[in-house]
Amino acid sequence: MGWLSQKIGQQKEQQAAVWLKTQAITIVAQNFRCKGGEIDLIGLDTDDTLIFFEVKYRQSSTFGTASESVTPQKQQRLIQCAQNFLQKHPNYQACNMRFDVLFFEDNQTQPEWLQDAFWS
């Protein structure tokens, strides 16, 4: 990933975190890294559901939409990272959990929110 793409990605992740707070989501971790992957945002909603967020941005749909870029391989890496997060933070193990995707396209200031994007 080039420097500019990385910078835009970080901006969109921060934008998503701010927006999620307006949706009553408490951010418990950002950029959680583990062997083989990273989870952009991890949040807790008002009914104590732990949500693992992947944030995606696409300037154009030439190579597919932002939501289409979460491939089965990427899903597996996110699932493995989520398991690692739960091992390191056992206080969240009793929570309901889900994987959501927040995606920005073009000049959107608010993401589109795909809940229950995939299952583990």
From Swiss-Prot:
Gene3D superfamilies: 3.40.1350.10. GO terms for molecular function: nucleic acid binding. NCBIfam families: PRK12497.1-3, YraN family protein. HAMAP family: UPF0102. Belongs to the UPF0102 family. This is UPF0102 protein Tcr_1695.
